[in-house]
Amino acid sequence: MQTYKVVVLGASGTGKTSLTVRFVNGDFVETYDPTIEDLYRKVIETNKGEHIMLEIMDTSGTERYLAMRDLYIRNAQAFVLVYSITSRVSLLELENIKNYICQVKDRPISQIPMVVLGNKCDLEDTRVVFPEEVEALTKKWGIEDFLETSAKIDMNIQSAYDCLTLQLMSKQSFLNGSSNGKDKKDKKEKKTHKKDSGSNNSSINSSSSSLSVSGGSNLSISSSCSSSSFSNLSNSTSSTSVNNLNQSQTNAPIRTKSKRSLKSAKVDKNPKGKCLIM
């Protein structure tokens, strides 16, 4: 089963956690508890009848956890940008987030699956942001899908993830490439380093030479072996493992991934409907 990483981003207090919990568990979170990091999983069915796994990272909206947010953006394939219709500041912040995503991913926004959600649309009496202006703004940004949502009354949340899933399927060719320019640069540097290492080994093996070691002994290198064969090593103050010479140049630290707590997961068959853009 194919797994896609989705990151939910937006200002603090816009209802990111409530939207995510409503989508994954079908529940509404009444109390506000600032999030540091929560990972949710849900299996959904695509419009082609295939099942995929969405790993949804609910992030903090505070500046304190920017370093963590960078890591999530770098590893994610899709993004949910959330603002509150009761806060114009939260809408203005989305443009900075959108620009930063493009910078980290090193791609145009047209190649990145992304939806913009205007949350808390059940609070009509305190609305300060209207759908017409946001629709014009997202069109200017190049974002395909914009919806107004409500975690409280469960409005348009399923439709939002339907739209995001369709984008994931249609932009599959971009997702299969390198996640960003930095990855391409790292791969190029590794390839160059490997080539240089190979050239150095070839120059060592191409001719016989005599190396002076402690105690006045000679260390012979034979060109007839693919891996250097050493002989006539005597009167040395300590025995040396020759094989470690090559290994010490190629060994690299192994990175491990920390475990994250996973919330509940369930299988949901999405209705195959057209995305509703408000």
UniProtKB/Swiss-Prot annotation:
Keywords annotated in UniProt: Cell membrane, GTP-binding, Hydrolase, Lipoprotein, Membrane, Methylation, Nucleotide-binding, Prenylation
Disulfide bond found in the keyword field: no
GO biological process: mitotic cytokinesis; negative regulation of cell-substrate adhesion; negative regulation of substrate adhesion-dependent cell spreading; positive regulation of cell migration; positive regulation of positive chemotaxis to cAMP; regulation of cytokinesis; regulation of sorocarp development; signal transduction
Residues bearing PTM Cysteine methyl ester: C275
Subcellular localization(s) per the UniProt record: Cell membrane
Catalyzed chemical reaction(s): GTP + H2O = GDP + phosphate + H(+)
GO cellular component: plasma membrane
Top-tier EC class: hydrolase
Annotated membrane topology: Lipid-anchor
Molecular function via GO: G protein activity; GDP binding; GTP binding; GTPase activity
Motif (Effector region): 32-40
Entry keyword Amino-acid biosynthesis: no
Family: Belongs to the small GTPase superfamily. Ras family.
Listed NCBIfam families: small_GTP (TIGR00231)
Annotated spans, Disordered: 176-209, 236-278
Residue ranges listed under propeptide: 276-278
Binding site for GTP: 10-17, 58-62, 119-122
Predominant location: membrane
EC identifiers of the protein: 3.6.5.2
A Pfam short name: Ras
Protein name (database record): Ras-related protein rapC
Lipidation (S-geranylgeranyl cysteine): C275
Bias type Low complexity, positions: 198-209, 236-251
